[in-house]
């Protein structure tokens, strides 16, 4: 039994797709356990970029099984579109498996997402308007429609009719919005269900059988710990649990079967949307990092907010997700800066604190306490070992590991597979 969980340790966009793709080379099964098509990851293979939102990164390995687990909320329209995109690129999807227990995102979820966000005015949380939150709301309220229901024509019609009647009343009476048509949704989405039917199964059986047989299973999280609905910057969070604990709920695999948790982070920090961000940069350094790092959302295209590396955030992520190994990405983006900074603690009303407050009001008053390190001017994109890094870059990497309290297993100096450098094999250490 060998399993590794990959989680984002910041606010998403840390390069999880790249690291998952890298670790997938030694895995036999790759599974997603939460989120939906609000999560975007970019994978570079032989210089070619692939952008995925729902399908696991392991799909590019045809001999390996890729799983969309029960904790994922699936937009069938987006899924069918993504499958077509992969087929057009010559990528087979015969190795894809989709949980019959996963919940379905329907047009009324997306419309409700938009209406709710608009109604918040200045208090918007920055949702991607993909219907993720409303779909998880229906799931928690026990009125959601699952993939298994979507495939059964009569059950789908019955449940869609009940749900749509309720949502349309909400649209008309509360939001003064246009109701949606039952027939149009039913025909379109039932057809999508038939298109994906071949991939649908009980994925918990596949995952547990693989683990019991001693196969290597890799679990891929979406978003990041700081967007976790329980452990993140609530309410500026997603509606699921990206933390490693979400694996057990979102995949049907027990906690005793998890061996390693790899936390993925960038050498700086970024986030899309609103919410607290203590180390955010508003100056020319921030603009430079954004442009050099191509910090624009994979899903939304929105410019990401950027800031210095925050070890307070990282220690929080380490605690709540049980991180055993760290993968540090995008070190190359910091090349050319005379000085690089790391937030080591916060100043809250004159008191130094080392933990991440739950209170948004306290977070607004938190000022980062920085440790400054000398930067490096060299181009490091061709570096293939820690020793090849300039001394100042090497010191930066080591200091990050010390402050977070987790050993660094890999570091990356660019988006390509070949630009990921191994310090310690995660699989070999299990």
Curated annotation (Swiss-Prot):
Q: Where does GTP bind?
A: 12-18, 40-42, 304, 330-332, 412-414
Query: Pfam families given for it?
Result: Adenylsucc_synt (PF00709)
From the UniProt record, give one GO term of the biological process aspect. Answer: 'de novo' AMP biosynthetic process
**GO MF annotation list:** adenylosuccinate synthase activity; GTP binding; magnesium ion binding
Sorted UniProt keywords: Cytoplasm, GTP-binding, Ligase, Magnesium, Metal-binding, Nucleotide-binding, Purine biosynthesis
User: What are the record's GO terms for cellular component?
Assistant: cytoplasm
- Name the protein family: Belongs to the adenylosuccinate synthetase family.
- Oligomer status and interactors: Homodimer.
- This protein is called what? Adenylosuccinate synthetase
Q: What does the organism's lineage look like at the top? A: Bacteria, Bacillati, Bacillota, Bacilli, Lactobacillales
């Amino acid at each position: 039994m060998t399993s590794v969980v990959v989680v984002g340790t910041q606010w998403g966009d840390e390069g999880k797709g790249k690291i998952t793709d890298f670790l997938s080379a030694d895995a036999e099964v790759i599974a997603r356990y939460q989120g939906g098509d609000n999560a975007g990851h970019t994978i570079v293979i032989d210089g070619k970029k692939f952008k995925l939102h729902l399908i696991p990164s392991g799909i590019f390995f045809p001999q390996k099984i890729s799983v969309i687990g029960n904790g994922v909320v699936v937009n069938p329209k987006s899924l069918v579109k993504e499958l077509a995109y992969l087929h057009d690129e010559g990528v087979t999807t015969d190795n894809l498996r989709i949980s019959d227990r996963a919940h379905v995102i329907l047009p009324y979820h997306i419309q409700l997402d938009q209406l709710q966000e608009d109604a918040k005015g200045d208090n918007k949380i920055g949702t991607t308007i993909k219907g993720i939150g409303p779909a998880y709301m229906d799931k928690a309220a026990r009125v959601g429609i699952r993939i298994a229901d979507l495939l059964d024509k009569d059950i789908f019609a019955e449940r869609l009719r009940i749900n749509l009647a309720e949502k349309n009343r909400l649209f008309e009476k509360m939001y003064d919005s246009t109701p949606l048509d039952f027939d149009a949704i039913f025909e379109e989405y039932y057809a999508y269900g038939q298109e994906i039917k071949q991939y649908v199964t009980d994925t918990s059986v596949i995952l547990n059988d693989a683990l019991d047989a001693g196969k290597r299973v890799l679990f891929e999280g979406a978003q990041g710990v700081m967007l976790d609905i329980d452990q993140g910057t609530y309410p500026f969070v997603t509606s699921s649990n990206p933390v490693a604990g979400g694996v057990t709920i979102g995949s049907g695999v027990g906690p005793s079967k998890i061996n390693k948790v790899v936390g993925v982070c960038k050498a700086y920090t970024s986030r899309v949307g609103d919410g607290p961000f203590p180390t955010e940069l508003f100056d020319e350094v921030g603009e430079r990092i954004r442009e050099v790092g191509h910090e624009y959302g994979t899903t939304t295209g929105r410019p990401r907010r950027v800031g210095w590396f925050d070890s307070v955030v990282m220690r929080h992520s380490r605690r709540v997700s049980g991180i055993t190994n760290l993968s540090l990405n995008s070190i190359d983006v910091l090349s050319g800066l005379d000085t690089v900074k790391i937030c080591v603690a916060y100043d809250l009303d004159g008191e130094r604190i080392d933990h991440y407050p739950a209170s948004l009001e306290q977070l607004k008053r938190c000022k980062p306490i920085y440790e400054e390190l000398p930067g490096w001017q060299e181009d490091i994109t061709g570096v293939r070992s820690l020793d090849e890094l300039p001394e100042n870059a090497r010191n930066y990497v080591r200091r990050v590991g010390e402050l977070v309290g987790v050993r660094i297993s890999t570091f990356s100096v660019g988006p390509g597979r070949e630009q990921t450098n191994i310090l310690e094999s995660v699989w070999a250490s299990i």
